[in-house]
A protein has these predicted regions:
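Auxiliary Fe-S-binding modules of radical SAM enzymes
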Residues: 2-144
Length: 144
């Protein structure tokens, strides 16, 4: 498969959607969380050269959810750079983290979270996956 990046996380139902009526048919939140971590781990084993996102949905279930996603095999965190005054208008699910922070606070928070799992943000590097770089280097006319 020619995949550069995957973002996946637990399904979180929203009260204003048609699927909310089926919430009783879903796995409990903690099971969805654990399943998501296992999915990240399996995907990392299957595709070691792609980018995998530790989603904010993980953090909405567990305060350290994104960190657990990183430990399971994710290697990308996506900062919320939406201006603070607009964040409340874009709530895909309840308990969305960081809606009361501005962009600078969000970036500082992410840096601290990454350090907590023994990693560091590489500000001076592009975030292209190894798979993407290799694919681009193999295209005709591309310099290696």
């Amino acid at each position: 498969m020619n995949i550069d990046m995957v973002g996946m996380g637990p399904f979180l139902e929203h009260a204003d959607t048609p699927l909310f009526q089926f919430q009783d048919s879903l796995l409990p939140l903690n099971e969805r969380f654990n399943l998501s971590l296992r999915m990240i781990a399996v995907l990392r084993i299957m595709m070691p050269d792609i980018n995998i996102v530790a989603t904010t949905a993980l953090q909405s279930i567990a305060p350290m959810g994104r960190e657990q996603g990183l430990k399971a095999g994710a290697n990308v965190l996506m900062p919320n750079l939406t201006p603070g005054k607009y964040r409340g208008y874009y709530l895909l699910y309840e308990n969305k983290p960081c809606i009361d922070e501005d962009a600078d606070e969000c970036l500082d928070c992410l840096a601290n979270r990454v350090k907590m799992v023994g990693e560091e943000i590489r500000y001076s590097e592009f975030g292209d996956s190894k798979h993407y770089i290799e694919r681009k280097n193999q295209e005709p006319g591309t310099k290696t």
